[in-house]
Amino acid sequence: MPRKPRHRVPEILWRLFGNRARNLNDAIVDLIPNRNIQPEQCRCRGQGCLGCSSDKPAFLLRSDDPIHYRKLLHRCFVVLHEQTPPLLDFSPTSWWSQREIVERIIEMMQSGCDCQNVICARYDKYDQSSPILELLTSSSWEFLLKRVGHDVMVYLLQQTSIFLPLLGKKHQQVSGPPLCIKHKRTLSVHENKRKRDDNVQPPTKRQWLSSAVDDCPKDDSATITPIVGEDVDQHREKKTTKRSRIYLKRRRKQRKVNFKKVDCNAPCITPSTNGKVSTGNDEMNLHIGINGSLTDFVKQAKQVKRNKNFKFGLSETYSVIPPNHILKTLRPNCSDSKLLMNHIFGEVNVWSTTPSHGKGNCPSGSICLYHSLLKSLKNLIGKTKSSHLKMLLDKHCPVLLLQEDALKSGTTSQSSRRQKADKLPHGSSSSQTGKPKCPSVEERKLYCTNDQVVSFIWAICRYIVPESLLGTTHQMRVLRKNIAWFVSRRRNEKCTVNQFLHKVKPSDFPFFARKELCCMVNGHELQSESIRSTQQMLCTKWISWLFLEIVKKLVHFNFYATESQGGRLNIYYYRKRSWERLISKEISKALDGYVLVDDAEAESSRKKLSKFRFLPKANGVRMVLDFSSSSRSQSLRDTHAVLKDIQLKEPDVLGSSVFDHDDFYRNLCPYLIHLRSQSGELPPLYFVVADVFKAFDSVDQGKLLHVIQSFLKDEYILNRCRLVCCGKRSNWVNKILVSSDKNSNFSRFTSTVPYNALQSIVVDKGENHRVRKKDLMVWIGNMLKNNMLQLDKSFYVQIAGIPQGHRLSSLLCCFYYGHLERTLIYPFLEEASKDVSSKECSREEELIIPTSYKLLRFIDDYLFVSTSRDQASSFYHRLKHGFKDYNCFMNETKFCINFEDKEEHRCSSNRMFVGDNGVPFVRWTGLLINSRTFEVQVDYTRYLSGHISSTFSVAWQNKPVRNLRQKLCYFLVPKCHPILFDSNINSGEIVRLNIYQIFLLAAMKFHCYVYEVSRFWKLHPQTLFKFITISVRYMFRLINRRVRRINTGSSFRPVLKLYKEEVIWLGLDAYIQVLKKKNSRYRMLLIYLKSALSKHSLSQQLSSELRYATDRSNSSSLWKLNY
C-alpha cells in the first residue's frame, strides 16, 4: 500500500499561527458543522452535498478531480483567526459565479472603509480587475464553488486569511489582514521543529509573534557517542539555556560593562581580556568573538568565527604580542603575578585567606599549588618581555620575497642568520640553522602554510610558558594538535572553547595534582573530593586561557588572514611584511582607471568613500569593492529594480546575455531541437569560446550612460510589497519591489530577494512607487563617476570601468555588451551567414542544411556555435580584432576553437578538455560541452587545484552530526540543473553519467565531512548508512522537482526519461566506489552498502546506459580529485 503523502503547513505559517493554519481541504472540512440528517431532509433534496455527507473529505476531493483542483486544496493554506465567528448557515447552491462573488466582496469592503484587507489591493473599479481578483477567479476556484456552495466561499473570502503558492517556497497572501511581524524573535535550536500535540504546553521562553506554537522534542535519531576526556567531561558545568542574540551595539556596550566588572577586581587588566584588541588590529581578518569575562568560559559557549569579509591590516611591530596584552602590561613581581592569577582563575575561596609574602614563598617551606603558580606566572610574565620572540616568528614563518628581490637579499639574509644562530631561544637547534636558506618563492605564493603558523605558535608557547604548565609529553602533543585544528579552520566556521579542550585531561598535568592547594592556615582543611574538583577546575581554566589569550591573539596580531580567489573557503595566512610587499607591487595595476584627487575635493566627497579589499589570485590581486553599507540606500534599490524590470520585460536589450545555467538551458534547448528537426541528427558543429579582457575595467563610462539613456522610459511605476521570511532562528520582513505588469498572472520580483531559498510570504498592500528617468540617470552617473576610495592618505576617483562587487555591476555590464552585440556583432553574423550561403550556391552543391548559429554570453564569456566552419572562423577573427569603439578586446590566452584555423594553421584548443575516453569538450562557465554532440556535463576539473574539504564548512556549534543528514542532501543541490537531465539535450547514457558524477562528488564530500566530525564524535555505521540511503532517495525527488518547476515558456517542454531504481542504484554504487579507497575507516559501512546494492533489482542485469555511467574512464577528472 503506497504511503499517504504529507501536506505540511509551511514553517512560516506554523510559527505565526500554529494549529490555526491548515490547508484548504482541512479548513473547509472543519468549517462545516456536523449535522446528523438524512439527505432527503437536507437543502440539496437528496442530491448529496457537503453538509449531509458522512465522509466530507471524500466528497470534497474525489479520484476523478482535475489536477489543478487537487493542487488548490493541498497547496493553498487558510488561517482561521481566533475571534472569527463560526459558520452558522450552509447552503450547497450558489446564485453567482466566482468572479461576481469576489467582486461584490471587494466592493462591499471598500464601501465600508474596510480597505485593510489584502483582497482589496490594486482593485480597479472601472475595469473591475486586479491581480488578486484574477488569482481568486481561476478555474480551480470555480470548481471549488460548485462543491462547497455560496456560503462557504463568502465565509472564506471575508473571515479568513488565504495564502496561495507563488514560486518555489514562496506564498502570496490574497485575503485577510496584512501579515506583519511586530517584533523579531530569535529561536533556540530545539525550537526549529514542530510538535502537533495540543496537550503539551510550549515553554515560557518561546513567545511567537501572533500566537504560541507547541514545542517539540529533540531529534535523537542519530546515534552518537561523544569522544571527550573523561576527567574534563565529568566536571564541566551544564550549559545555560541559549539566549536570543542582541544587536551589535548592545553587545559592544555589554562588553564594556563586563570589562568594568573585571577591572574592579584586577586593576591592571586591560581591555584585551575580553577578547578585543584595541591596537588597530581589530581590522584584521581573523575575528574571534568572545563575550564576557574569561573566568566563566564554561558557562558560556564562546565561539570563534571566521568572518566573510576581510580588511587591510597594519604594519608589523617589533613584538609578536599585542602591546596592550595583559602580559605586556604586568611586571614580573609577586603582586602582578597575583593579578594575573585572579584574571585567569577568578576568585578561589581557598586562596582568599592566604598570606602574602614579598617573594611568594610558602611560610612553612613546603611547596603548595598557590605559591607554585605565583612563581610560574612570574616566569611567564618575564619571558614575555624577551626580544627573542620576534626571531621565532622569522624562523618559523620567514618573510617570503618576490623573485626580483630574492637575489638582492640572498647574501644579506645568509650572513644575518649565521650571526643569530647562537642566540636562538628555546625550541631551536643548530642542526636546523646550519644550512642557510634564502626564502624565495613563486611571485604570488607569499603566504605561510598552516604548519608554519602552528610551528610558530607552539614555539612561542614552549618559550614563554613554563614546561610544568604544559603538562606531560603526551599532553603537549594534544595541545599542539588542537592548535593545528584551530589554525586549519575554514571561512564562516565557528568553534567553541570546549573543542579546544578536546582530549585535555587534568590528570596529565602533574603541576595541578599537588596535595596542598595552599598553605594550611588556622587549621583550614578541605575534603579530598573538594580538593580534586578544584584542581581539575583550575587546570581546565588554565588551558582555556592559554588558547584564548595566547594562541588566538598570536594569530590575530601577527598574520593577515584572507581568502583567495581559487582557494574557495580556505584561509591563507600572510606575514604583514609579505602582504605589504605584494600590495605595493600590485597596487599600480589595481588602480588602473583611477586618478588621484586633491584633499579639498576628497573632503567634500568623504561620505561617498567606497570600502574595498584585495583578493589574492593566481596572477596578482583583485581589488573588490564592498558596497554592503550603500545597499540600504533607496536610490540603489530603485535603480536595481528598474534595470531588473527591463531585463524581465525587454530581454532583447541585453543581447545574448544569460545569467545562470537555467537561462542557458532556455536558450540552448530550442536551438538543438531545431537542428535535430531538420535532418534527424545534429550536423557538425563549430565552436568559438572567448573571454573579454578586463570586462568591468574597460567599460567606457560615457558610452554606458548613453546606452542606458537610450532605452529608459520617462517614468516607471513599481509595486512596493513586503516579504515575510522564515529563517532557522527568526522571522523578519524585507521590503521588495514587484513589476507592475497587469498582463502577468503572477508577481515578478524586480528587486533581488536575498533569501529566495527560504520559506516566505509576499504581502501586497497596494502601495506604488514612482521612479523617474532623470533620477535614474543621476544615480547611475554618481555610481560610475563619483566612486572614490582611499588608500593610506591618498584619495582616488574612478574614471573608467565599473566597480567590481557593486550590486548593479553585472546588469550594467550586460546592457553595455548587449548594445555592442546589437550594433556590431549581429549585423556581422548576418553578413557572414549570407556570404557562406552564396559560396555554397556558387559551388553548385546541394545545401542540405541552411547555416544556423547561436551566440550566448555569460557576463563576459562568449560561446558561439555554428553549423558553418567559415562563419565560425570569420567570427573568431572578428573577435581577435576587438571593438575599438567600445574599448572591448578579447583575452588572447582564453580563446578556444574546435577546428583548425586556415590563417594560423593550427587548432587553438588550449582550453579544450579531453578525458581518458578520448571525447573532446569545450569548457564554458563551469560546464563541459561535447564538441561533437553538444551534450552537456559538469566541469569538475576546477576542483583539481585544492582539497574537496575546502568546498564546504562545518557548523561546529550546531551539532554537526545531526546536520549530516541534511548536509548530504545539500551536497546534491548545487550541481543538479535541468540541463543535465533533459533528453532533448543529453542521451540516456550522459543523463545517468551526470547523476553518477554528482553522487561521486557528494560521496567525496561525505568522507571529508565525516573525517572532520569524527575528531569529536563517533559515528555508527548504521546511522551513516541511514543518512546515505535518505540522500540517495532524495536525489530522484530533487531531479523531478527541478525539471518540473523550471519555467521554459511555450517553446519546448523538458523530457525526463529516468527511473527511481536507476538513481538509487547509481547512488549506492558511487558511494561504494569512493569509500573503497578508505576501506579501513568504512569497513562496516561498506558491508551495509554492498548488501543493499546486491539486493537491488537492477544488479542482476545492468543496462548499457548504467554500464556507461559507471565506467571510470568517463569520470576520469573526478577520480583525480584530492579527498
Curated annotation (Swiss-Prot):
Protein name, UniProt field: Telomerase reverse transcriptase
Residue ranges annotated for the Reverse transcriptase domain, each copy included: 596-929
A biological process from GO: telomere maintenance via telomerase
Quaternary structure note: Component of the telomerase ribonucleoprotein complex. Interacts with POT1A.
SMART domains the record matches: Telomerase_RBD
Other observations noted: In the absence of telomerase, telomeres decline by approximately 500 bp per generation, a rate 10 times slower than seen in telomerase-deficient mice. This may be due to alternative telomere lengthening, a process which is activated in early embryonic development.
PANTHER family for this protein: TELOMERASE REVERSE TRANSCRIPTASE (PTHR12066:SF0)
